[in-house]
């Protein structure tokens, strides 16, 4: 029977890929710095995670019971209780940047009360977020802000500032998702309009005499 790795902590995720744990409740990671690449594994998330995938170094073959729409240049998100099966591409070193944080990090903050509004964390969602080049840079800039805060000595403002920057990233992702679905709706409507025009032309030409 396949073993399921329980990612109940940030430290457990860092251990899986050979990262140094800077903070017990949050990590900003870059897969180019990873030293461990299990060829295939299944994880049960106990933390929140978002990843910007920059190449085809791995594939998520199962996300719950659905195949994940996960291509190059996309963001995927995971929440506590979700199960994911990952297969590494043996010919390509994975390139991805990501954020992992434990629910305890945001406990008692305004963000904790808003998490249910970030629908891209939903278990039923199997669609990745496809970013433009500008959006990718915004995503990376948000990660850098969090990373800068993690590199500072902890003080009474640390938790609040880290949480606020995570919330900023999540709000940007909501904006990007909205843009993605609006764009798709316009494209689908355009296709339907052209199809209806073709039908009108067909019936005009073939109208019974």
Task: Give each language-model segment a name.
Residues 135, 142, 158, 162-165, ...:
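Amphipathic alpha-helix face/heptad-repeat signature
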Residues 58, 76, 81-87, 106-107:
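Histidine-centered metal-chelating micro-motifs
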Residues 130, 153-160, 175-208:
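Short, Lys/Arg-enriched, Trp-marked, Pro/Gly-tolerant hinge/linker segments that flank
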Residues 65-77:
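Short acidic-glycine-tyrosine-enriched beta hairpin
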Residues 49, 138-145, 165, 169-172:
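Amphipathic, well-ordered alpha-helical segments in soluble domains
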Residues 20, 89-152:
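A hydrophobic/aromatic-rich effector-binding and dimerization subdomain
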Residues 54, 71, 80:
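A cytosolic small-molecule/anion-sensing beta-strand core signal
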Residues 1-68:
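Generic protein-terminus/edge-of-domain signal
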